[in-house]
Regions:
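Ordered, amphipathic secondary-structure segments that act as subunit-interaction surfaces
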Residues: 66-75
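Short, glycine/acidic-enriched capping/hinge loops at junctions between secondary-structure elements
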Residues: 27-32, 53
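Short glycine-enriched loops at secondary-structure junctions
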Residues: 20-25, 45-48, 74-77
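Active-site alpha/beta core segments
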Residues: 12, 16, 23-26
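Short helix-loop-beta junction
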Residues: 33-41
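Divalent metal-coordination and catalytic microenvironments
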Residues: 18, 42, 71, 154, ...
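Divalent-metal-activated hydrolytic enzyme cores
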Residues: 1-13, 37, 46-64, 79-167
Length: 167
């Protein structure tokens, strides 16, 4: 709306950072009923946290004064499905950048499984949750985020029901 545009023309003041997947079915501004300037959204396949993404999160917290970080994963995630469906670990051949995404998901999931003594089979929902948990952990361990005492929450959006679950 025009009022939101005018209110944000001289700078942004988002109250929250949303780290989510680039899946077109996951639209944080719509899911959380927010407008222009309310959310600082970081999107990539699999809601992974790279150094670049972490820099964006730090920027939002340190320079835009965002008080909340939400890691929002979702069901039917293509990055997770690629990992779960890859029975022969073909991603290890690194044929393309998609394999890099699957490799990162695999590393995250295996790390969480080892820490929690979770069965080794590739369960899709378990892998989705492990992926969300891993991204949350990276953010929580960041010294800038700790220094600002930023609230961090983990959520999973169900593309079948439209419901969001806190993890």
């Amino acid at each position: 709306n025009k009022k939101s545009v005018l209110n944000n023309q001289n700078g942004q003041h988002p109250f929250a950072v949303i780290v989510t997947c680039s899946d077109s079915r996951v639209a944080p501004e719509i899911l959380f009923d927010q407008g222009i300037g309310d959310l600082f959204v970081i999107r990539n396949a699999g809601n992974l946290i790279s150094d670049i993404d972490m820099g964006s999160i730090e920027y939002a917290v340190e320079h835009l004064d965002a008080k909340l970080i939400v890691v929002l994963g979702h069901t039917e995630c293509g990055a997770i499905k690629a990992y779960v469906g890859d029975k022969n670990n073909d991603y290890k051949k690194h044929r393309n950048h998609i394999d890099d995404i699957v490799q990162t998901v695999a590393e995250e999931v295996e790390e969480i499984k080892e820490q929690k003594h979770v069965p080794k089979e590739k369960n899709e929902l378990g892998c989705i949750n492990a992926n969300i948990e891993h991204s949350t952990k990276i953010i929580k361990n960041n010294p800038i985020i700790k220094a600002h005492k930023t609230k961090i929450v983990s959520m999973r959006y169900d593309v079948h029901t439209g419901k969001i679950t806190f993890l």
